[in-house]
């Protein structure tokens, strides 16, 4: 059997600058939208002809921020608290023999401008700059299975956490909402999902976490089931 070499056909632009803040599913953070940019020679209008007639897409992508090495036959899914093991092929874990992922996303617009092609998407669960290897239309009658059994992922995700902003964080966000109109709402949506690793969730801690969203470093802590957004700092670009 011959090995297969893949080349990216596109990259995706998202607000998530690191994997720590990425939601676990694409529909959890409504304001966390993305844009797929097709790369040459695949940025031809002919390649996306008719795509606008579909409301949703499948993206096949690379977990490019995962350190590659010897794969393990079992993994610890976050939905099981990060403590119970299942087979790697019975999970959607990022650490896989081949670092490929599959994501269903909403297609909002196909834009062809100045020789470039952009696919404007709804909520996504991918890190900024993630390589895309293929794009396929979601076909409802074939892809939807209402009676499917999903083992440990059958139930919906836990209740969202309450999010509060310090006065300092509120002030910082307000100053930047002309450029990022929904910044406060977006940060709230990310934090209420509890971005911490599964094994840390539900445990008391005074630790202050930080994550990069757009061009901001967002600092926060969790106490008694409430997320407190402590600080929002604009990240200085390298000169």
From Swiss-Prot:
Residues 6-147 form the TsaA-like domain. Gene3D superfamilies: YaeB-like. It catalyses: N(6)-L-threonylcarbamoyladenosine(37) in tRNA + S-adenosyl-L-methionine = N(6)-methyl,N(6)-L-threonylcarbamoyladenosine(37) in tRNA + S-adenosyl-L-homocysteine + H(+). InterPro entries: TrmO-like_N (IPR023370), TrmO_C (IPR041369), UPF0066_cons_site (IPR023368), YaeB-like (IPR040372), YaeB-like_sf (IPR036413), YaeB_N_sf (IPR036414). GO terms for molecular function: tRNA (L-threonylcarbamoyladenosine(37)-C2) methyltransferase activity; tRNA binding. SUPFAM superfamilies: YaeB-like (SSF118196). The keyword Transferase applies. It holds the Pfam family TrmO_N. The keyword rRNA-binding does not apply. PROSITE patterns: TSAA_1, TSAA_2. GO terms for biological process: tRNA methylation. It is an enzyme of class 2 (transferase). Keywords: Methyltransferase, RNA-binding, S-adenosyl-L-methionine, Transferase, tRNA processing. S-adenosyl-L-methionine-dependent methyltransferase responsible for the addition of the methyl group in the formation of N6-methyl-N6-threonylcarbamoyladenosine at position 37 (m(6)t(6)A37) of the tRNA anticodon loop of tRNA(Thr)(GGU). The methyl group of m(6)t(6)A37 appears to slightly improve the efficiency of the tRNA decoding ability. Binds to tRNA. NCBIfam families: tRNA_TsaA (TIGR00104). Homodimer. PANTHER family: TRNA (ADENINE(37)-N6)-METHYLTRANSFERASE. Belongs to the tRNA methyltransferase O family. This is tRNA (adenine(37)-N6)-methyltransferase. It comes from Haemophilus influenzae (strain ATCC 51907 / DSM 11121 / KW20 / Rd).
């Amino acid at each position: 059997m011959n090995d297969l070499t893949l080349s990216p056909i596109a990259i995706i632009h998202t607000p998530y600058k690191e994997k720590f803040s990425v939601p676990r599913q694409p529909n959890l953070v409504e304001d966390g939208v993305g844009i797929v940019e097709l790369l040459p020679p695949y940025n031809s209008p002919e390649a996306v002809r008719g795509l606008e007639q579909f409301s949703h897409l499948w993206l096949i992508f690379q977990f490019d921020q995962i350190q590659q090495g010897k794969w393990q036959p079992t993994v610890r899914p976050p939905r099981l608290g990060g403590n119970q093991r299942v087979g790697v092929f019975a999970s959607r874990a990022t650490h896989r023999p081949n670092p490929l992922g599959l994501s269903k996303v909403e297609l909002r617009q196909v834009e062809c401008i100045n020789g470039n092609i952009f696919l404007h998407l709804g909520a996504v669960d991918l890190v900024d700059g993630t390589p895309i290897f293929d794009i396929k239309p979601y076909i409802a009658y074939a892809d939807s299975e209402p009676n499917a059994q999903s083992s440990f992922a059958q139930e919906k995700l836990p209740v969202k956490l309450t999010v509060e902003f310090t006065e300092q964080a509120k002030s910082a966000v307000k100053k930047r909402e002309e450029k990022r109109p929904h910044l406060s709402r977006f940060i709230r949506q990310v934090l209420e999902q509890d971005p911490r690793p599964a094994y840390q969730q539900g445990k008391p801690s005074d630790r202050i976490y930080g994550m990069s969203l757009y061009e901001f470093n967002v600092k926060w802590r969790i106490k008694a089931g409430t997320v407190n957004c402590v600080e929002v700092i604009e990240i200085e670009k390298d000169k």
